[in-house]
Amino acid sequence: ELLQPGDIIIDGGNSRYTDDARHAAELEPKGIHFMDCGVSGGVWGIDRGYALMVGGSQGDFESARPIFEALKPEGDSGLVLAGPVGGGHFAKMVHNGIEYGMMQAFGEGFATMVKSDLVEDPAAVMSSWRDGSVVQSWLLDLLAIAFKSDPTLKSMPPVANESGEAKWMIEAALELGVPTPATAAALYARQTSRGGADDILRVVSTMRAQFGGHVTKIDEIATH
């Protein structure tokens, strides 16, 4: 074996928090310590630093602190011991659920302005929110970068994948009795974008046609 008693394994992937306690329990008889670390920052983290949410004991956290300090952004924020083993991945799961909701809200706002005759340049409006607005954020900064090369975003396919964390958050929230309608709506929107609702909507359209004669024709769907 390559590991020795006293060594620490840090899981820095987007792993499910429910697996962390099991991993720690499997390693404990061998004297090997386990920590989980939620990591945020995407491809920009290599230059900006990564936000790190750690789960584990205080002692292990202090032992591994030099590693975390080397990866985090400069300054006082960007690194937190979220709780015991599992806490880091749980915090990152919630972080990603919030991210889903924020991106969905920006998308809905953009689409509403595109459909309106009153806003001539939705991309310019959203880009202007980067300074002084209560909705300014790094996500909006990234969107503004994309707007510079494609103000309509027509080059981007209207499909959004999901990696699982929002679903896990909704499941955890249900167990805890916490309502998460915004996160759920954002997750369902992504699933719908991949055609997951096609058969559902065919059933709905069929029933409308049967009970009320409401026939939906593709070429009659309003576009703008």
Segments from the language model and where they lie:
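Structural/interface elements that position substrates and couple domains in central-metabolism enzymes
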Residues: 15-18, 70, 74-77, 112
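Rossmann-like NAD(P)H-binding beta-loop-alpha module
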Residues: 53-70
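Short phosphate-engaging motifs
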Residues: 16, 60, 105
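Helical "substrate-binding/catalytic lid" subdomain
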Residues: 49, 53, 63, 76-79, ...
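Metal- and O2-centered redox machinery and metal/ROS homeostasis
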Residues: 21, 176-178, 218-224
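Acidic-glycine-rich active-site phosphate/pyrophosphate-binding loop
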Residues: 28-29, 33-35, 69-84
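Rossmann-like NAD(P)(H) cofactor-binding subdomain of soluble oxidoreductases
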Residues: 1-51
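ATP-dependent carboxylate/acyl-activation modules
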Residues: 69-73, 209, 213-224
